[in-house]
Amino acid sequence: MAIERTFSIIKPNAVAKNVIGSIFARFESAGFKIIGTKMLHLTVEQARGFYAEHEGKPFFDGLVEFMTSGPIVVSVLESENAVQRHRDLLGATNPANALAGTLRADYADSFTENGTHGSDSVESANREIAYFFGEGEICPRTR
């Protein structure tokens, strides 16, 4: 199976809970290599651009408001079958449906404030990674 990259966001509510290290530890325990990461505070323009595919949907404005309410941590993760494995670790988007032991079951507050984001396909991962990271900011780990 080929090595893939996926994109992850630790959202403002999870950052505010001070669980960044716990989430990173779970990524690494699950076999992911963290090959790029940074903390930033999204502007409204950045959030609207990142979530452009949802513009016009009823939840869009609330999502932008939430994602700009505090710092986030964006990361590039690498492993075999990274996209699906990361989504499995995150759990269902709606935390009410998330299995026990998933990140959203443990750290989400609501459907919108669900603690984490993960790419839904390799194509999305490539686009999302490029939105936040230049090639020089990603450090493949060979050891």
From Swiss-Prot:
* UniProt cofactor(s): Mg(2+)
What residues sit in the active site? 117 (pros-phosphohistidine intermediate)
According to its UniProt record, which reaction does this protein catalyse?
A: a 2'-deoxyribonucleoside 5'-diphosphate + ATP = a 2'-deoxyribonucleoside 5'-triphosphate + ADP; a ribonucleoside 5'-diphosphate + ATP = a ribonucleoside 5'-triphosphate + ADP
UniProt enzyme class: transferase
What EC numbers are recorded for this enzyme? 2.7.4.6
Intracellular or extracellular location(s):
Cytoplasm
Described function: Major role in the synthesis of nucleoside triphosphates other than ATP. The ATP gamma phosphate is transferred to the NDP beta phosphate via a ping-pong mechanism, using a phosphorylated active-site intermediate.
The entry's family comment says: Belongs to the NDK family.
Q: What is this protein called?
A: Nucleoside diphosphate kinase
UniProt organism field: Cronobacter sakazakii (strain ATCC BAA-894)
What is this protein's gene name?
ndk
